[in-house]
């Protein structure tokens, strides 16, 4: 792999709001914007391997429809918020366009009969779906290397990983293929690749964005979220996809402040908590330096920096690697070669179990198999109490630590946000 990457060799791509506003002012057509995105993807994807599918023909049809409708939509201010904006979708989110593969041989030919709620809402907001992105298989991984389609490469430096599991979404946006993309985050899968590719990414509050149409990994942890070059570009995408969905029983009913409103919140008076654990001696020196610079920047802007303690945070990784595989072993049991996924050939007379075993062995990669085995182990009768129930107790203690940090009760820190490294 070459050392230099696409992102360092090309000019910074247009930001989401700039694209949308240029279309609204009539300076560019949707066709021009989408054509540019398709050209970037077609010429660059061989180097980054960020995309599993490019929808060139379908995107151009959609662009023509939007351009034709432009004259009937009234003044620029009445245009849908993402009108004409190219968007990339992580390939574990269902789309009627193309296939939904989860970067796995198990689903390499699967075509969804419906769009995920988040995808439908993007289209309703005027977005143009131009591609689906590579990922660690079934969203299990943190480097972008565990994919049936091959590893994703960081566009800033092809010798480095982009992070994962939303590796393709992050690499695609950083390389300028589209101004924003959807990913999914179970244990850092939006935030970590966004950090490694120099982007802004958010894992929304659980239930804020519908999971209907997201292929399940660990259902109590999975969330869909956006990534883009800056918070101002993430906000309109999050606004478009958030909201209650009766098709998702975990979807929140409560109203939430819009992202654009939060962007205008004054820094002066904000209370930002810095956990003692974030200043760990285990941090890389460059991470510690950037953290302290960020703290100083917020303090200079008028924020109040509050030292807080999250005493059970160190148990988070251990709890995650018990809870997530346990849920995955249950969720992925449906891929048996009968109901879903790849079906291996069997000879006449072989038992049904042979077809199950062969289908799953051929269909799942090594990382997915490892996690299924781990999850099955911690749920087994001899270890359920010692591992799984202990991990659930640890999660409750971690949640309590954060609840106390955000509490406005007398004597509590009462912070508005917690400031800590993403990786």
Q: Where are the regions a protein language model picked out?
A:
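An N-terminal boundary/leader segment
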Residues: 1-60, 293, 300-302
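Acyltransferase
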Residues: 30-35, 64-67, 258-259, 283-310, ...
């Amino acid at each position: 792999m070459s050392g230099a990457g696409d992102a360092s060799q090309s000019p910074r791509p247009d930001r989401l709001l700039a694209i949308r506003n240029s279309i609204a002012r009539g300076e560019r057509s949707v066709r021009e914007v989408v054509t540019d995105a398709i050209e970037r993807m077609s010429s660059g994807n061989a180097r980054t391997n960020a995309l599993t599918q490019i929808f060139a023909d379908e995107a151009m049809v959609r662009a023509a429809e939007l351009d034709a409708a432009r004259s009937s939509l009234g003044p620029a201010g009445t245009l849908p918020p993402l009108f004409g904006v190219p968007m990339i979708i992580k390939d574990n989110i269902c789309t009627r366009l193309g296939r939904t593969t989860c970067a796995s041989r198990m689903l390499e030919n699967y075509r969804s009969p419906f769009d995920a709620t988040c995808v439908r809402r993007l289209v309703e907001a005027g977005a143009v779906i131009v591609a689906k992105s590579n990922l660690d298989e079934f969203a299990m991984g943190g480097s972008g290397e565990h994919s049936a389609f091959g590893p994703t490469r960081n566009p800033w430096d092809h010798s480095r990983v982009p992070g994962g599991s939303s590796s393709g979404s992050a690499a695609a946006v950083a390389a300028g293929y589209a101004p924003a993309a959807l990913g999914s985050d179970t244990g850092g899968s939006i935030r970590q690749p966004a950090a490694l590719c120099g982007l802004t990414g958010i894992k929304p509050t659980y239930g804020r964005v519908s999971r209907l149409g997201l292929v399940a990994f660990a259902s109590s942890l999975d969330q869909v979220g956006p990534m883009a070059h800056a918070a101002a570009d993430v906000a309109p995408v999050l606004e478009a996809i958030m909201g209650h969905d009766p098709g998702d029983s975990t979807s929140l009913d409560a109203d939430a402040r819009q992202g654009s409103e939060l962007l205008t919140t004054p820094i002066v008076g904000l209370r930002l908590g810095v956990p003692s654990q974030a200043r760990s001696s285990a941090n890389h020196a460059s991470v510690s330096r950037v953290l302290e610079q960020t703290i100083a920047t917020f303090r200079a802007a008028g924020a109040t920096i509050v030292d807080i303690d999250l005493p059970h945070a160190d148990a988070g990784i251990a709890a995650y690697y018990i809870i997530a595989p346990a849920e995955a072993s249950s969720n992925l049991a449906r891929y048996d070669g009968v109901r879903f996924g790849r079906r291996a050939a069997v000879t006449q007379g072989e038992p049904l179990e042979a077809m199950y075993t062969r289908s799953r062995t051929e269909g799942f990669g090594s990382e997915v198999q490892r996690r299924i085995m781990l999850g099955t182990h911690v749920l087994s009768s001899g270890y359920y109490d010692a591992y799984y129930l202990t991990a659930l107790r640890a999660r409750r203690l971690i949640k309590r630590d954060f609840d106390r940090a955000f509490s406005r009760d007398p004597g509590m820190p009462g912070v508005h946000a917690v400031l800590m490294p993403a990786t």
